[in-house]
Design a protein with these regions (language model features):
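Ligand/substrate-recognition segments at binding pockets and active sites
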Residues: 26-29, 233-234, 260, 269, ...
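Detector for C-terminal structural segments
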Residues: 33-41, 79, 233-237, 241, ...
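Surface-exposed binding/hinge segments that line
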Residues: 49, 107, 151-206, 226, ...
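N-terminal lobe/hinge region of extracytoplasmic solute-binding protein
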Residues: 55-110, 139, 222
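Gly/Pro-rich hinge or "lid" segments in bacterial periplasmic/extracellular proteins
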Residues: 92-93, 97, 188-256, 260-261, ...
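Extracellular/periplasmic solute-recognition and catalytic clefts
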Residues: 141-146, 151, 161-162, 230-240, ...
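Ligand-site clamp/hinge motif
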Residues: 215, 244-295, 440, 449-456
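Structural transition elements
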Residues: 227, 354-403, 427-434, 535
Length: 609
């Protein structure tokens, strides 16, 4: 399955023949020079020694076309990786703590958040990383609303980014919200760009962001991370270790990352990744592999079900701008009709705990204190109950017409035929396709006229953010972050950035709870504003319980299953030293991905291929 990680409140890809494939190169003829990061004539495939090359998967489908760090759609390793561009800090979801990266320290106050940049941090061209680079990066979001850092400004979370001194950057919080959580999330997710490189390019583009984004930036990428782009083709992308990486001395006592090359082969399907992992041609991946316990030589975080750490909730998002999806009775009927056990056991191979109603993870040690089993039992609809689904349909005045046991149509209370509800999902995302098929089968059996609609991923993303759908499948806030679970509720429920169909938004994708519309529930936005400022734990539990209760009663989205942040899987045929639940020195994130980047310094060649 292909999955692209997105910055959601500021707002993941996959797939093996033998991975030692030739690539185009424009300048250098082989990987011998650490300083080269050019793309694309042919280099000898044998040049990449197996004991020097780590093969990763799950973050790239299709021929690479864009390495621009400001683009909304980027190729590996720019897309959510810390290999070339780095974030201010990283987040450890196992411990719920921030970890230094470009910023060596941070300070959260009632009206501001400050980050002090490590004086040792350098770009790979030798220039220092300074507060000016950080300020410039986030100021771009103020200037251009299409960039991923813009919601800090458009959401009115900050009013200013200023330099306290050359190495210290202070984000001034909006005086009415005083919400530091989105700033901390941004510090984890937004990769800092070099002002001395990007600003002249922006000027050359006439300060037009659309013109700037036409530059795919596949040559001489100036980043602060431990690797450089070496070469790419339609078959693979290769990065090469920067032996002068500033973090070697700061974090690892001068030690270099173990792999000289980190390579992402480009394949057609999850099946290819499965074969690659089993044969040892791919070392680690984040792709969905069904029945991982049956895959020879392939390991995961846990050695028994659910194998992966559940951290997200894939959902169906009804477009409440259109009838009948604006009817809460229909939405609750849809929720009751779904066979969640089939989804968990068949579609996702048991990689999930049983689903509970609401948007709080009841098994997560950091947020289970906010979950109320009593409320879920009394008010929740995320359980398979066909009779309850039919009762909700009846209350809403709907009539289902069957012939020979098959649903023919559904009529509303006026007797008018209800248009077939299409559920949109990307083609090729195999686990999502399976989920949607189970959902459609369940809904039709309960009398709800729904059909699947699988579309190309390039169309999916545009439709998702402009509300061009009846119902769409999407996972909000995929990466765990400092603001969890507040951010999950904010992305689903917030009316602060509500927009009509056709306008791009990264939150409230179903356009629920229009602040200027009838039936606006003001308490939702009140709670979303209050929770980040609550210090008393008992009051925080109370506030989350109320917010979760509102969600369950109104069912603006339909949670389907719990899912891993990423399907962290690996084989130790060529490299050893991956973290697991039995040895959790780092979280279950593939090398190069966020804090998982530090796995690269713990790996050792296995002495195999």
């Amino acid at each position: 399955m292909v999955r692209r990680p997105l910055a959601s409140a500021l707002i993941a890809l996959a797939c093996v023949a033998v991975p030692l494939l030739g690539c185009r190169k424009h300048k250098n003829t082989g990987p011998a020079s650490t300083g080269s990061n050019q793309s694309g004539s042919s280099s000898s495939p044998t040049a990449f020694a197996r004991n020097e090359t780590l093969y990763v998967g799950g973050r790239q489908w299709g021929e690479p076309s864009n390495f621009n760090p400001l683009a909304g759609w980027q190729d590996w390793p720019v897309n959510s990786m810390n290999l070339i561009y780095e974030t201010l800090v990283m987040y450890n979801p196992v411990e719920g703590k921030l970890v230094p990266l470009l910023a060596e320290s941070w300070d959260v106050k009632g009206d501001s958040v400050s980050f002090t940049i490590n004086k040792a941090a350098k770009w790979n061209d030798g220039k220092p990383v300074t507060g000016e680079d950080v300020k410039y990066t986030f100021d771009l979001g103020k200037q251009f609303a299409s960039l991923l850092m813009s919601p800090l400004w458009t959401g009115k979370y900050i009013t200013d980014v200023k330099l306290t001194d050359p190495q210290t950057v202070t984000f001034t919080l909006d005086a009415t919200k005083k919400n530091a959580l989105p700033v901390l999330d941004a510090a984890v997710e937004i990769r800092i760009v070099p002002k001395h490189v990007i600003e002249p390019m922006m000027t050359a583009a006439g300060n037009n962001i659309d013109e700037f984004l036409k530059n795919k930036m596949d040559k001489e990428l100036v980043g602060s991370g431990p690797y450089k782009l070496l070469t790419y083709s339609s078959e693979k992308i290769v990065t090469q270790r920067d032996d002068n990486y500033w973090g070697n001395a700061v974090f690892f006592g001068g030690k270099l990352a173990a792999p000289k090359f980190v390579t992402h082969p480009i394949f057609k399907s999850n099946d290819h990744f499965s074969v690659g992992l089993q044969q040892g041609n791919v070392d680690t991946s984040a792709s969905f592999l069904p029945r991982i316990q049956e895959k020879k030589n392939v390991k995961a975080w846990y050695d028994k079900p659910p194998y992966f750490v559940s951290a997200t909730i894939p959902m169906l998002w009804p477009n409440v701008l259109q009838a009948p999806l604006d009817d809460v009775h229909l939405r609750r009927a849809m929720a009751f009709s779904i066979n969640y056990t089939d989804i968990r056991e068949l579609a996702v191979s048991g990689y999930s705990d049983p689903l509970e109603s609401g948007m709080i993870l009841p098994f997560d040690k950091l947020e289970n204190k906010y979950f109320s089993a009593e409320d879920a039992k009394q008010f929740g609809a995320s359980r398979y109950d066909v009779e309850a689904a039919k009762a909700e349909l009846k209350t809403g005045g709907y009539t289902s017409v069957f012939k020979d046991g098959e649903l023919v149509e559904m009529k509303d209370k006026s007797g008018k035929k209800v248009p077939t509800i299409t559920i949109k999902s990307p083609t090729g995302w195999t686990d999502w396709e399976s989920i949607v098929k189970i959902v459609v089968k369940s809904m039709r059996a309960a009398g709800i006229d729904a059909r699947e609609k699988f579309v190309d991923a390039s169309l999916f993303w545009g439709d998702l953010y402009t509300a061009d759908f009846d119902v769409i499948m999407f996972t909000p806030t995929a990466p765990p972050s400092p603001s969890t679970p507040w951010r999950r509720f904010d992305v689903v429920l917030s009316g602060a950035e509500w927009a009509p169909k056709g306008e791009k938004r990264y939150k409230n994708l179903g356009r629920f709870n229009n602040p200027k519309g009838p039936g606006y529930i003001a308490r939702i936005d009140e709670l979303l504003n209050e929770i980040p400022r609550i210090k008393d734990e008992a009051e925080l539990v109370k506030a989350y319980r109320e917010l979760n209760l509102i969600f369950m009663k109104n069912q603006p989205t339909l949670p389907l299953v719990y899912r891993a942040d990423q399907f962290y899987e690996f084989t130790e045929q060529a490299w050893k030293g991956f973290p697991t639940a039995a040895n959790p020195f780092l979280p279950p994130q593939m090398p190069g991905d966020r804090l998982g980047t530090r796995i690269l310094w713990h790996l050792t060649p296995a002495g195999g291929k």
